[in-house]
């Protein structure tokens, strides 16, 4: 099968047809959402997957809530018009905290969001100190503070918001080395603590991609917790019980919002995850 880059107007050679499978969209502002997709694919390998990333507005962490809601709804709408969806996963903590109500109101298929894994982290911590590593947007939003009040009110929560770590994760996917010195600088507030967090919530879907490097920088024995496996289980349940019969026999496909050199350079990465085709998605608005 040939590798394919499409600008949204050029027809491409489809992969060898297969049996129709439920179509699931995984969406993120960048390509960090592949960490969630990988967990879902591990549990549910026989689905028709679409991965969409918004390389025009990336990163979302610094955008307004109104902008994010409008943008995410427009992108999911554009995908749904191309491929009827059985389910959509918003594999972006920032987008999930603000856009899920609008998505669920507009669409009949289930929409799964990603929220920081504060509840399991509160159960796992031994010293009662939990770190939340996320974008600044996620750290600031009331939804995050409500999760903490509900599930971790007996824990000491230390929050760090970083847009730079998102960029480091994207760079790693492009094949660049991750600077441990940069991570140490970002994590300095924790590393200087007399008793730092023993459990760290990776509150951005980009951050599991940096797990290896984080474990080299954080104190030995630190647990890293993310939502990927829980999202996969939730996806499986919803597909069985609530999803519409929306299937496709097409090959998995990835969509970007602009066919830039940076997007084109991601094709080998996307191919490793099972997406042979990268195409520009036309989005209104």
What are these regions (language model features)?
Residues 2-285:
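Non-catalytic structural scaffold of enzyme domains
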């Amino acid at each position: 099968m040939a590798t394919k880059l499409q600008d949204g107007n050029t027809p491409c050679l489809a992969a060898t047809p297969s049996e129709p499978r439920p179509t699931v969209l995984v969406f993120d502002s960048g390509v960090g959402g592949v960490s969630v997709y990988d967990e879902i694919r591990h549990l549910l390998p026989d689905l028709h997957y679409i991965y969409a990333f918004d390389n025009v507005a990336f990163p979302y962490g610094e955008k307004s809530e109104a902008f994010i809601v409008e943008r995410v709804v427009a992108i999911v709408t554009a995908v749904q018009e191309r491929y009827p969806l059985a389910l959509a996963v918003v594999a972006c903590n920032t987008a999930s905290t603000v856009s899920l109500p609008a998505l669920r109101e507009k669409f009949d298929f289930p929409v799964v969001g990603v929220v920081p894994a504060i509840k399991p982290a509160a159960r796992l911590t031994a010293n009662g100190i939990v770190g939340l590593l996320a974008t600044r947007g996620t750290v600031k939003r009331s939804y995050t503070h409500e999760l903490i009040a509900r599930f971790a009110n007996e824990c000491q929560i230390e929050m760090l918001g970083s847009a730079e770590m998102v960029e480091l994760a994207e760079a790693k996917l492009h094949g660049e080395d991750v600077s441990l010195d940069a991570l140490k600088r970002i994590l300095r507030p924790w590393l200087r603590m007399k008793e730092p967090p023993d459990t760290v919530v990776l509150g951005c879907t980009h951050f599991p991609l940096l797990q290896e490097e984080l474990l080299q920088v954080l104190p030995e024995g630190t647990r890293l917790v993310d939502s990927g496996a829980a999202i996969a289980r939730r996806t499986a349940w919803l597909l069985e019980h609530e999803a519409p019969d929306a299937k496709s026999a097409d090959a998995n496909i990835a969509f970007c919002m602009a066919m830039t050199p940076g997007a084109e350079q991601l094709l080998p990465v996307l191919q490793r995850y099972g997406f042979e085709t990268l195409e520009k998605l036309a989005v209104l608005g």
